[in-house]
């Protein structure tokens, strides 16, 4: 079964673990998500819940969006995503908060990477440059397209748009859950720029060996007591 929530990347900071190690963490603000729809095998062919995140002004939403949100007694949402095989029983209109996770859980984080525009083969693909000596005529170009056939083979690594791709980082540790401020602290970096949307779900690699990470001065039970 899967747990999931939508959030917004705030930025990065540092915290100390109980062992005294200083680690980098990413702060994710995940205000309460609203369950817009509950899907099941009988009606939709699969089990899932549809989550809505961040209110959208009514003037910017169309009638179908307004009608869909009204069934859950809420306003239209800017972001709508699905979580398949969600853990627990849900009804339309329920809220999912950060306390669905706890410190020590491992999650998969999906986001849109930073866009870098049109870039050459060296920056985008890490290819080697040519000689920089005078008269070389070959410095930062992609190189030969092939000496025989009069076309470019599919899959040829060439300059082009860099970044702005959907990427998932697996097995990211949750270092701390701040229920009062709707924050999750995730170990390390995650895809995307600040303020970008992140989808956080339970990790799919449940059998992987995960080292335990605990934030100094905060016990696992402290988060539950705050809630």
From Swiss-Prot:
Quaternary context: Part of the 50S ribosomal subunit. Forms a cluster with proteins L14 and L19.
Keyword Transcription regulation among UniProt keywords: no
GO molecular function: rRNA binding; structural constituent of ribosome
Protein purpose: One of the primary rRNA binding proteins, it binds directly near the 3'-end of the 23S rRNA, where it nucleates assembly of the 50S subunit.
Domain of life the protein comes from: Bacteria
Cited SUPFAM superfamilies: Translation proteins (SSF50447)
Keywords assigned: Ribonucleoprotein, Ribosomal protein, RNA-binding, rRNA-binding
Protein name: Large ribosomal subunit protein uL3
Similarity comment: Belongs to the universal ribosomal protein uL3 family.
Matches recorded under InterPro entries: Ribosomal_uL3, Ribosomal_uL3_bac/org-type, Transl_B-barrel_sf
Keyword Acyltransferase: no
């Amino acid at each position: 079964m899967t747990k999931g929530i939508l959030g917004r990347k705030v930025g990065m900071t540092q915290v100390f673990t109980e062992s005294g190690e200083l680690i980098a963490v990413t702060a994710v603000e995940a205000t309460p998500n609203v369950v817009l729809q509950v899907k099941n095998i009988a009606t939709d062919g699969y089990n899932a819940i549809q989550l809505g995140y961040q209110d959208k002004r009514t003037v910017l939403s169309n009638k179908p969006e307004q009608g869909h949100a009204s069934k859950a007694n809420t306003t239209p949402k800017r972001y709508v995503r699905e979580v398949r095989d969600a853990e627990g029983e849900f009804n339309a209109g329920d809220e999912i908060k950060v306390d669905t996770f706890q410190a020590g859980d491992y999650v998969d984080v999906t986001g849109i990477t930073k866009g870098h525009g049109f870039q050459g083969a060296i920056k985008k693909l890490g290819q080697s440059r040519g000689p920089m000596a005078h008269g070389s005529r070959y410095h930062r170009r992609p190189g030969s397209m092939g000496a025989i056939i009069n076309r470019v083979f599919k899959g040829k690594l060439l300059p082009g748009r860099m970044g702005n791709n959907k990427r998932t980082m697996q097995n990211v540790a949750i270092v701390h859950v701040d229920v009062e401020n709707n924050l999750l602290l995730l170990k390390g970096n995650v895809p995307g720029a600040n303020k970008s949307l992140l989808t956080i779900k339970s990790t799919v690699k449940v059998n992987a060996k995960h080292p335990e990470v605990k934030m100094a001065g905060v016990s696992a039970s402290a988060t539950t007591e705050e809630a």
